[in-house]
């Protein structure tokens, strides 16, 4: 059987660089190497692109994926053809955060006309920007917690007014978030104005735009969505924490998080969550995959928190585990995502690019 040529891209110029490497390690070890000829491209923290061809062995440590000493090549050379001498059947970007899941690299793949896994330019960008995402959810009628947003330049000029707005509109605790970052990087839970000021200072180190959200005493529920024009959603799972706040450290380092799949919820609540996840997928015109995150209160009030256009595939990750619960194994999920990428690219070829 002739193998298909796949290129996995990971790393990236982002605060989520190490998360991307963890994800790449998991996917490389799970992908069907009898079906796929796999090359990898590592993007350093400085933005250099380095390639390694024909990965066949198990990746036992993330250290093996830091290709710092590899030859830096032009991007067009890296993606022109695989190490087998044939064009790539699909590129699989496993990049998290800015320059990876925000539409930028997706735009590159579009210009190069390369099939790629995951969301397109618009859906990736709108899912990355928490303010734009919330505005799209609002337009779709999806329930959300109160929030405000502002720019670094606005805060520097109107700090007093913005702090007053937060205190007038929201109740503590609140969560301060960089608008364009994931994996809980730069996020703070603030219980008073002093902590709020520190949280704002911390978040502005990562982005020029912040979102401050009302906190709520609720369970954190997640639903995985898979597909293109006709997506499917899993039964919900729950993030069960041994910590007060599900931050970067608890997500990826401490292991103080357990996943309960499926979540212990009434069936009607589970069905509502599945339907809302599909609505969120459509609201941001997604394709391939999305993880939709929700809050569910004790009286079963549901609020959508966000969608993640490139959810992680690490050992702690909810997305692949939700699909395993639906009967789709990890290797089968990877294969399905590649097939969806090819399907979307084939559909794009139906478009006309000149007027007769």
Curated annotation (Swiss-Prot):
<keyword id="KW-0464">Manganese</keyword>
<keyword id="KW-0963">Cytoplasm</keyword>
<protein>
    <recommendedName>
        <fullName>D-alanine--D-alanine ligase</fullName>
        <ecNumber>6.3.2.4</ecNumber>
    </recommendedName>
</protein>
<comment type="function">
    <text>Cell wall formation.</text>
</comment>
<feature type="binding site">
    <location>
        <position position="293"/>
    </location>
    <ligand>
        <name>Mg(2+) 1</name>
    </ligand>
</feature>
<feature type="binding site">
    <location>
        <position position="308"/>
    </location>
    <ligand>
        <name>Mg(2+) 2</name>
    </ligand>
</feature>
<keyword id="KW-0547">Nucleotide-binding</keyword>
<feature type="binding site">
    <location>
        <position position="306"/>
    </location>
    <ligand>
        <name>Mg(2+) 1</name>
    </ligand>
</feature>
<dbReference type="GO" id="GO:0005829">
    <property type="term" value="C:cytosol"/>
</dbReference>
<keyword id="KW-0436">Ligase</keyword>
<dbReference type="InterPro" id="IPR016185">
    <property type="entry name" value="PreATP-grasp_dom_sf"/>
</dbReference>
<dbReference type="InterPro" id="IPR011127">
    <property type="entry name" value="Dala_Dala_lig_N"/>
</dbReference>
<dbReference type="Pfam" id="PF07478">
    <property type="entry name" value="Dala_Dala_lig_C"/>
</dbReference>
<feature type="binding site">
    <location>
        <position position="306"/>
    </location>
    <ligand>
        <name>Mg(2+) 2</name>
    </ligand>
</feature>
<keyword id="KW-0573">Peptidoglycan synthesis</keyword>
<dbReference type="GO" id="GO:0009252">
    <property type="term" value="P:peptidoglycan biosynthetic process"/>
</dbReference>
<dbReference type="GO" id="GO:0046872">
    <property type="term" value="F:metal ion binding"/>
</dbReference>
<dbReference type="InterPro" id="IPR011095">
    <property type="entry name" value="Dala_Dala_lig_C"/>
</dbReference>
<dbReference type="InterPro" id="IPR013815">
    <property type="entry name" value="ATP_grasp_subdomain_1"/>
</dbReference>
<dbReference type="GO" id="GO:0071555">
    <property type="term" value="P:cell wall organization"/>
</dbReference>
<dbReference type="InterPro" id="IPR005905">
    <property type="entry name" value="D_ala_D_ala"/>
</dbReference>
<dbReference type="InterPro" id="IPR000291">
    <property type="entry name" value="D-Ala_lig_Van_CS"/>
</dbReference>
<feature type="domain" description="ATP-grasp">
    <location>
        <begin position="134"/>
        <end position="339"/>
    </location>
</feature>
<dbReference type="GO" id="GO:0008360">
    <property type="term" value="P:regulation of cell shape"/>
</dbReference>
<comment type="pathway">
    <text>Cell wall biogenesis; peptidoglycan biosynthesis.</text>
</comment>
<keyword id="KW-0479">Metal-binding</keyword>
<keyword id="KW-0961">Cell wall biogenesis/degradation</keyword>
<keyword id="KW-0067">ATP-binding</keyword>
<dbReference type="Pfam" id="PF01820">
    <property type="entry name" value="Dala_Dala_lig_N"/>
</dbReference>
<dbReference type="GO" id="GO:0008716">
    <property type="term" value="F:D-alanine-D-alanine ligase activity"/>
</dbReference>
<feature type="binding site">
    <location>
        <begin position="167"/>
        <end position="222"/>
    </location>
    <ligand>
        <name>ATP</name>
    </ligand>
</feature>
<dbReference type="GO" id="GO:0005524">
    <property type="term" value="F:ATP binding"/>
</dbReference>
<keyword id="KW-0460">Magnesium</keyword>
<keyword id="KW-0133">Cell shape</keyword>
<comment type="similarity">
    <text>Belongs to the D-alanine--D-alanine ligase family.</text>
</comment>
<dbReference type="InterPro" id="IPR011761">
    <property type="entry name" value="ATP-grasp"/>
</dbReference>
